[in-house]
């Protein structure tokens, strides 16, 4: 700042949201390589009144793309240029400047917010602070965390936005984009066509409804920029226009204007009712109304959402860089719980998840440049080539340990078994190495206690993203995870527990001395808890003593007991069934397809069949030695039970043969291809095509031809869909069913003679049901 005198005014409150108002580059020794950014902060003072505050920061060039795959390829001048384009377009233009370079905008959004947090000093949105504002410049200089504030549990004040804007977009333009990029989401294709050609229908109606704790407005427009034909409520009850004169660096004076909410700082929208285009149409209208009058610097108005990814994304979100300055949250339903989930995600990540994806937690870190690995960890990793044992583990388990002691299908009984799982395992290791990352640590700690379930995908994304962003950190975490697995295995052996299968962050095995006939389920669980505690102590010792890591006791690894079991059956490393016959609790069955509801129903029946097979053996073998005669009797009854199971399943699915949602599968990335032109006439359905597509297979008119894939969710409910090819959906499921039954028959065969085989071809016998 060039101001020679600073006059501070202090005010208590908290930050609700922060958005880039404008940005620029300027010459000078301190900023010649950086990007200057003016932030608008929507704040709430201690009296409960919303107040606008503004802060100027400089994002250094080396910080701009630090955690991006772009590396240092995007200059500060480029960032300033795209921001200028997003604030100087026509007032009726769509805020689609990020289309085609969304990653660059996400990088700008994340790095600028990270810099703002470090410069001002606040911990997070909604945490109580004391604002220090220079009255000479109008700029916020500092925020001092207030640890002793009376109100330390601030939460968002939410309103509800509903909008309907059935915009028509040139079908030929959408088709061209869809054909040009194989597998492009139709939402992306529509936005591309909209940005290039605009609306094909000038009189698109817009219906808007906003509900806040103390206000309600509704407007209905015949076309977007015409006067409303229906109105209810006053916009002044919703927000007001506020102007401020600011003096920026270089003594440059500007006037800014914002929409300041009266009773909300977040608007929630139900994604099943309101499309992103409808929200953008509403905000575009408000933007034009707010800045149609000249005399102020216009803010950036740029949209970031899953529709901007050509392949779509797994999660729904809505983010605008710049205008309107408050937060817009997408919810799966209008229910209170869904809104609570959305606001929790926003509060814990300052709105950076899921919009910035794998980079989100890097932008929440207290540092700019990531700190190096702890010295002892670095030294041990450097010794790997000379240490054969460690080298083998690292080479063979380069994504985490996956191992089993079994070479063929096996069934286990007579001894108690248990399954264990480390809570938030890989993020916990990261936090043990870098305990200064308090924001991540808070979420990891909550996940250890089964809290913040909505952020579990964020943690998974964070760890997976390390492989691309910080590969050395990723390799170090895998190295430590593998060392932990060896430590756990040794500790378990000392406790009389043999690990059978170990998969990354969990394992199951058998207590060698706990007989199921002599020990009850509660006693077995007590033994499992004692084993978990012993493993936790051993792992904590490994991390603290051998690796030299210094972290708080609250962040010590937690090994959770998933269950104790009397019987087990495993047919491959990732396929197993565990059951507690004494308590008759639902079995733990993994390694079976579950992509559709039909698959999940068969999985449930298969799990029940395995329980039945166990009970049959218990009944037949009671007080007898298991021999070939008993095996043959058992196997015959199991085969008969398997027949009854698939017949019951076929009867069940027969009643659902015309129900698309029952058969629906998520399309795999490798299957994605251009959508046929016949889907391009349903614009309102295309706007929802930004997630992995759901498909069903329908019968080919040619009886000898392959089934046809139908993207049924992109069709209106009144569409006539050809008969579902149930047999095509069932074929892989029944194949798995038959294969596992044969593995079961092999697992129980302790004799040299061949096992009985389940030779049925269920589909061949019952295919007539689905013709």
From Swiss-Prot:
Please list the coiled coil stretches: none
Q: Name one GO cellular component term.
A: host cell nucleus
Keyword Transmembrane appears in the UniProt entry: no
UniProt keywords (A-Z) are:
DNA replication, Host nucleus
Pfam families according to UniProt = Herpes_HEPA (PF03324)
Which InterPro entries does this entry report, sorted A to Z?
HSV_HEPA
Gene Ontology biological-process entries: DNA replication; viral genome replication
Signal peptide annotation: none
Its annotated compartments are:
Host nucleus
Q: Which family does it belong to?
A: Belongs to the herpesviridae HEPA family.
Q: What does this protein do?
A: Component of the helicase/primase complex. Unwinds the DNA at the replication forks and generates single-stranded DNA for both leading and lagging strand synthesis. The primase synthesizes short RNA primers on the lagging strand that the polymerase presumably elongates using dNTPs. The primase-associated factor has no known catalytic activity in the complex and may serve to facilitate the formation of the replisome by directly interacting with the origin-binding protein and the polymerase.
How does this chain assemble?
Associates with the primase and the helicase to form the helicase-primase complex. Interacts with the origin-binding protein. Interacts with the polymerase catalytic subunit.
Tell me what this protein is called.
Answer: DNA helicase/primase complex-associated protein
The beginning of the lineage is:
Viruses, Duplodnaviria, Heunggongvirae, Peploviricota, Herviviricetes
């Amino acid at each position: 700042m060039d101001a020679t005198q600073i006059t501070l005014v202090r005010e208590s409150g908290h930050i609700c949201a922060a958005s880039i108002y404008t940005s620029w580059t300027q010459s000078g020794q301190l900023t010649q390589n950086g990007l200057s950014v003016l932030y608008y902060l929507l704040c709430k003072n201690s009296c409960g009144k919303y107040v606008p505050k503004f802060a100027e920061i400089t994002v250094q060039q080396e910080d701009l793309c630090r955690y991006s795959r772009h590396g240092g390829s995007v200059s500060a001048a480029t960032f300033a240029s795209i921001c200028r384009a997003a604030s100087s377009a026509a007032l009726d233009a769509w805020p689609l400047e990020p289309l085609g370079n969304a990653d660059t905008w996400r990088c700008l959004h994340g790095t600028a917010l990270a810099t703002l947090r470090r410069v001002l000093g606040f911990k997070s949105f909604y945490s109580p602070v004391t604002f220090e504002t220079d009255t000479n410049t109008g700029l916020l200089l500092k925020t001092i965390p207030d640890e002793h504030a009376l109100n330390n549990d601030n939460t968002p004040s939410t309103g509800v936005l509903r909008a309907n804007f059935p915009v028509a977009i040139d079908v030929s333009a959408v088709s061209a984009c869809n054909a040009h990029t194989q597998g492009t989401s139709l939402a992306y294709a529509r936005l591309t066509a909209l940005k290039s050609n605009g609306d094909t229908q000038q009189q698109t109606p817009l219906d808007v409804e906003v509900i806040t704790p103390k206000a309600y407005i509704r407007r209905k427009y015949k076309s977007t920029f015409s006067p409303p034909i229906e109105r209810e409520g006053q916009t002044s009850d919703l927000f007001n226009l506020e102007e401020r004169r600011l003096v920026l660096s270089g003594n440059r004076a500007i006037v800014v204007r914002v929409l300041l909410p009266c009773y909300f700082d977040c608007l929630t929208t139900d994604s099943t009712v309101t499309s992103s285009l409808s929200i953008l149409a509403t905000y575009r209208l408000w933007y034009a109304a707010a800045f149609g009058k000249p005399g102020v610097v216009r803010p950036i108005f740029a949209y970031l959402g899953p529709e901007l990814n050509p392949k779509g994304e797994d999660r729904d979100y809505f983010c605008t860089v710049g205008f309107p300055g408050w937060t817009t949250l997408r919810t799966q339903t209008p229910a209170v719980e869904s809104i609570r989930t959305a606001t929790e995600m926003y509060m814990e990540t300052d709105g950076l998840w899921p919009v910035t994806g794998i980079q989100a937690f890097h932008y929440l870190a207290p540092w700019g440049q990531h700190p190096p690995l702890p010295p002892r960890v670095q030294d041990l990793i450097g010794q790997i080539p000379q240490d054969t044992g460690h080298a083998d583990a690292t080479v063979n388990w380069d994504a985490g340990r996956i191992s089993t002691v079994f070479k063929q299908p096996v069934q286990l009984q007579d001894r108690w078994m248990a399954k264990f799982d480390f809570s938030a395992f890989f993020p916990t290791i990261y936090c043990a190495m870098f305990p200064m990352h308090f924001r991540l640590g808070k979420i990891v700690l909550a996940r250890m206690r089964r809290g913040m379930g909505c952020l579990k995908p964020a943690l998974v994304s964070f760890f997976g993203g390390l492989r691309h962003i910080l590969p050395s950190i990723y390799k170090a975490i895998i190295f430590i995870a593998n060392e932990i697995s060896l430590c756990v295995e040794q500790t378990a052996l000392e406790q009389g527990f043999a690990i059978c299968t170990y998969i990354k962050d969990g394992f199951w095995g058998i207590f060698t001395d706990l007989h199921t006939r002599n020990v009850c389920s509660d006693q077995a669980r007590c033994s499992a808890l004692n084993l978990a505690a012993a493993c936790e102590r051993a792992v904590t010792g490994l991390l603290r003593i051998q690796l030299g890591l210094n972290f708080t006791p609250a962040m010590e690894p937690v090994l959770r007991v998933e269950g104790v079991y009397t019987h087990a059956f495993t047919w491959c490393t990732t396929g197993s069934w565990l059951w507690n016959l004494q308590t008759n609790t639902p079995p733990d069955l993994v390694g079976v397809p579950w992509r559709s509801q039909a698959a999940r129903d068969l999985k449930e029946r298969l799990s029940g069949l395995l329980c039945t097979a166990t009970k049959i053996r218990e009944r037949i073998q009671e007080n007898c030695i298991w021999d070939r005669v008993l095996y043959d009797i058992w196997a015959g009854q199991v085969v008969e039970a398997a027949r009854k199971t698939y017949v019951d399943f076929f009867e069940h699915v027969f009643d659902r043969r015309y129900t698309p949602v029952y058969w629906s599968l998520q399309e795999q990335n490798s299957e994605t291809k251009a959508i046929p032109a016949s889907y391009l006439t349903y614009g309102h359905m295309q706007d929802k095509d930004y997630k992995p597509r759901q498909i069903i297979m329908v019968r080919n008119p040619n009886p000898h031809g392959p089934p046809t894939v139908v993207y049924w969710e992109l069709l209106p409910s009144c569409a006539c869909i050809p008969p579902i090819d149930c047999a095509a959906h069932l074929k892989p499921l029944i194949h798995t069913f038959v294969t596992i039954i044969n593995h079961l028959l092999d697992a129980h065969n302790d004799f040299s003679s061949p096992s009985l085989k389940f030779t049925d071809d269920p589909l061949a016998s019952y295919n007539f049901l689905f013709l």
